[in-house]
Amino acid sequence: MAGHSQFKNIMHRKGGQDAKRAQLFTKLAREITVSAKLGSPDPNANPRLRAAILAARAQSLPKDNIQRAIDKATSGGDAANLEELRYEGYGPGNVAVIVECLTDNRNRTASEVRTAFSKNGGTMGESGSVAFNFERVGLIHYPLKAGAADAVLDAGIEAGADDVQSSEDGHDITCRPDDLNAVSKALEAALGDPEFARLDWKPLVQVPVDADTVPALMKFLDILDDCDDVQRVAANYEIDDAIMEKLGA
């Protein structure tokens, strides 16, 4: 299993699912608000907002919540105080990690992320210290039911994508960041709405993680995901399927 950006945890903990879902809805709405604030409130004229709305719909965020998040961007208030931050460092097993945040309190967020690194076997670095391990890409994800692998590949090529990967988890289509809006629109015409379309961090080099390190790494990533200000976590780990099956048994 290769590491990737994630809104959901790889290893789900029992209990607290309602709280987790409420937290996810808050993060999705916050991304919509900031996207609308930085660009146009019209998703057809704002690729980032359009991607944020698609991601929210895929997670069943109610339509009224989506509209309120857009309205918040144009009415000022709390939205004016939100800023984007990015932190980088290494987690257990020397895995490179990028943490993307939206916050109204830079000091609070920095403290939470720094604590997550320092107390869980990680080391936080300077900006750019691990980004060279990743490539910035546009990522469009479809479920398996969207079509057979060959059909999705053909649609991806026709849409101008750079790569199409199909697995039991679905279809991942990547493109240049500047092409995300055009490629996603072309794919929608052929395959329908994706589960999400967003800018992502694609690992250029993957770090194998042994069985002894996996639990610590998963705990660390889980703690980062649980931070209210963290929007997305990218990590360049690779875990053998046999190890994952053993740990999940």
From Swiss-Prot:
It is found in: Cytoplasm. Coiled coil: none annotated. InterPro entries: Integrase-like_N, TACO1_YebC-like_2nd/3rd_dom, TACO1_YebC_N, Transcrip_reg_TACO1-like, Transcrip_reg_TACO1-like_dom3, YebC-like. Keywords: Cytoplasm, DNA-binding, Transcription, Transcription regulation. GO terms for biological process: regulation of DNA-templated transcription. It comes from the Bacteria. GO terms for cellular component: cytosol. It holds the Pfam family Transcrip_reg. One of its GO terms (molecular function) is DNA binding. The keyword Transcription regulation applies. Belongs to the TACO1 family. NCBIfam families: PRK00110.1, PRK12378.1, YebC/PmpR family DNA-binding transcriptional regulator. This is Probable transcriptional regulatory protein Rru_A1086.
